[in-house]
Amino acid sequence: MGDQRLQDWLRSPGMDSKPWYCNKRPSKCFAKCKHRRLRFPPMDTQNWVFVKEGMDDFRYGCPSPEDTLVCRRDEFLLPKISLRGPQADPKSGQKKLLKKAALFSKLSPAQLARKAFVEQVEAQLMAKHPLAMYPNLGEDMPPDLLLQVLKHLDPERELEDAWACCETQEKTTEVPTEPGKHPCGEFCLKPPETPVSHLLPEPPETGVSHLSPEPPKTPVSSLRPEPPETGVSHLRPEPPETGVSHIRPGPPITRRRSSLLRQLLKLDSERKLEDARAPCEGREKTTDEPTEPGKYPCGKFCPRPFETPLSHLRQEPPKTPVSSLRPEPPETGESHLRLEHSKTRRGSSLRSEPSETGVSRLRLAPPKTRRGSSLHAEPSKTGVSHLSPEPPKTEVSHLHPVPPKTGVCHLRLEPPDTSQVSNLLLYILKVLDSGRTLKDVWDRCEARVKKTKEPTEPHKSPCGEPCLQPPETQVSHPHPEHPKTRRRSSLHSQPPKTRRTSSLRSEPPKTRRTSSLRSEPPKTRRTSSLGPEPPKTRRVSSLRPELPKSRRVSSLHPEPPKAPESHQFSEPPKIRASYIKELLQEDTPSTKECVSDSLQYRYTSEKLREFFKWAGDLGADEESIRNLFDFTPKYRATHEDQKFKKVKECSSELKYSMELDEKDEDKFFSQEKYWGRKFHTPSNSYTAQRVKMKYGAWYLKPKLWKKLRSDEPLIDPKLLLKKPDEPDVLDDLYGPIAFKDFILSKGYEMPGIIQRLFARRGWTYDSVKTPIQRAMIFYKYKEIVEASEED
């Protein structure tokens, strides 16, 4: 019964799959017959080919078929799959060797002899003492450290020479040394009796560390260094950091010693030599790091100072209260003075920079303290030397030097020179304010110009400017010996590009005969910037004053000139309105109307400016051309803030050439209130809803599945087969039957649509023919009716 039910259940509709116990069938890949070919040839182990390693690498092309190892079933034992039971391995039938049987070596006699020789040599080497491999150990290792190693590794004193050398050196090092000579108590290098090439001198007796000389006790410091007559070419005094002079030998070589110690300490597996490990590790670190010249990684070599004459020495600083000298070989024929910052409390320091030309330069560095000065002179290869004067003992941050005829520098404080600015303002007013509307400004400028035009002595103002005379304070007047050439020294200057230019804090001039003078702004409260006076030369210098950082000095903003201002403004300068407002900010209150009125006359279009430029190149004057014609600009220069204009406020010229009618214009401007609105697009009311679908029951065949909604019931496939066919249009027509008769009369093949029609209706070709009987009766009756109607 049970088997019958199982079979019925398996044969039920939709259950065509086989039971579970029928799924595990033997593989079809393996052949049952011996000579039968497999369905999958790669699975046949008899056809496998074994190749060497790398022959299956096809990344760089096909490998060459040479030296290919091919193993067939006749040459190699391959695993075979058979349907029979497992067979015994043929190797298992061989007799196994007994455990006590002697296994003979597979090495050749030559290999055995070589192996025995190597073992013999190793045994001889290991039989010696471990320290015998280092014959120079006593020379490279310190005696105290070598003694500690020998105590642990050679307690029986087999190395007699090493013990004797170590004990003798230990006795010599235990001798007391004098204080200051050997602070470390180790190897001391005796000073050689021969001259040494490079030495450092002893320190000065003063407390200066960085070559900062003491302040001079006298108000005048006149130094005239001359080239030395000895063989010493370079003198550079540098103070040492300690009280003992240092020789500059190369640093001791401890790398070899440390490597020997590391190899010896490897024998100390119990780490008994902790004292020996520490210096070894320390030396290893110091030898790896780069050391500065003159410094030693361990700091144990302290040589004595040499007392013999030397070839190259570094001169000691003088013990007198005179400024120290620091001569260096200059690149040109003149000496350069270097004035470093002093650490004392008097005055500022002067410093010169080396020049690439034959002109020496002095730079006035910002003083760090109040008083004192330091002078560092350099020797020259010629007999000429320039000296740097000491500033006066007054609290002045900016000095105004006047180069006199004798070459002495005079320093004095003077009020600022405003003649150039007054001339500039007066010329601007002549150009821009020809009607003299700004009367107050005209009066002030003319008054200032009159004051500056007072007669002066010829030796005071060579260029028509106020001369600054030397002060009456105590000022050093060094008189240098000038060479026969025209080279001059410059104070507080930058490197000039010419050889015949003297500049006071000058910028590189664009021409060869002009130099710009520029005063530095003072950092005090009640001092003003000083304008220097140029020397008596044929070159004219230009003044560029800066704004002083003081509270009681008026600020003047002159225009940055594009050409030298010494030509008294031969061309009208191009000045902007904002720049004029800054010039007139302090003297007179400027308003927007004044600026706009002054600029109204100067307004020109771009084409007119190009025309004036072209006429100016030909030699014509712009003002003369303006006087010939009447320029009435349509648009005035305005400085109002820009704002957005509406469409109604636009001028008629900005509108399109195609004008609108009155009705269209009213309609166009009436829509202005709707322009700012945002048009919201209507939201999509339709939202797609997810519908769960199903495709059929799992027990049905996939061919019978149909896409349906999850809530719809399934359709029985049997009912689909029993469903009657829908009536066709061709069933009641006369044409298909007549067409069938035509096909039969001709002997052609019957079309499929006619065959299906006759099969659906159950007709045969002989039973249904044309003419049809009912059709004949119908047409006969119709003819009778038509004939009766005619009668």
Curated annotation (Swiss-Prot):
The biased composition feature labelled Basic and acidic residues covers 274-288, 333-342, 449-462
Region Disordered, annotated ranges: 195-257, 274-409, 449-573
InterPro entries from the entry?
FAM47
Where composition is biased (Polar residues), the residues are 349-358
* Family label: Belongs to the FAM47 family.
What is this protein identified as? Protein FAM47A
Organism this protein belongs to: Homo sapiens (Human)
Q: What is the lineage of its organism?
A: Eukaryota, Metazoa, Chordata, Craniata, Vertebrata
